Amino acid sequence: MKQSLLDIILENKGPSKNEVAVTKVPSTPHDQAEGVVKGVLQVCDQAGVNPSKIELLYHGTTVATNMVIERNGAEVGMLTTRGFRDILHMARHKRPHNFSLQFDVPWQSKPLVKRRNRLPITERLMPPTGDIDVPMNEDEVLEAATLLKKRGINSVIVAFLFSFLNNQHEIRAKELIKSVHSDAYVYASSEVVNVIREYERFSSTAMNAYIGPVSYTHLTLPTSDLV
């Protein structure tokens, strides 16, 4: 991840008017939170304000956007209903040029989840009520979690058909994955975006997992350093 500059603005409410201090510090790609904390301490020192007196901290970042553009997000694994692992590949068949084979389809050539990491799980819910037609095979979930851990994949999504009607299988699968791979970031599609239509739900969850690990560490600021 390339280095850039962080803009830090401090507004200090005075008795008659608000005072504003501004500073810039280099970003710290190895640990984005480090640069933010450094910038806050620097602008507080510049304004003569005790960091512990900060009441509200707003934070805006393009870290997630840059990860998507530069294609350097997390390696993602996926557990999905057997027979439906190619939903992320097919999408909605909307293409830039419907009848041309000579163009790039980004979600196929640069998928958020590589096909080999999309693992099918035997389970099935039925609309319109979400009743369980085929119980989830928990052994398959454990085997899939073990395989993804062996591959060094620490960001995993669980995306089952019709989970917006009943997320029982997804939540249980998430628990099983964590029991095998406790350090993994695990996202259930029904928790990320609980909407009808599989592609929209699956792809949104995949995007969340793609940017999630780095974004999480970036947003988990060591506030103890500000006291």
Q: Can you name each region flagged by the protein language model?
A:
Residues 1-77, 134-155, 170-189, 213:
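N-terminal glycine/serine-rich phosphate-binding loop of ATP-dependent small-molecule kinases
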Residues 16-23, 112-132, 198-206:
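Gly-rich Lys/Arg/Thr-decorated short loops/hinges at beta-loop-alpha junctions or inter-strand turns
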Residues 74-130, 189-193:
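Active-site phosphate-binding/coordination module
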Residues 159-169:
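Glycine-rich phosphate-binding loops at beta-strand->alpha-helix junctions
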Residues 181-205:
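Conserved phosphate-binding/catalytic loops in two-lobed NTP-binding clefts
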Residues 203-216:
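A polyampholytic, Gly/Pro-enriched intrinsically disordered region
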Residues 217-223:
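Conserved small/polar residues in nucleotide/adenosyl-binding loops
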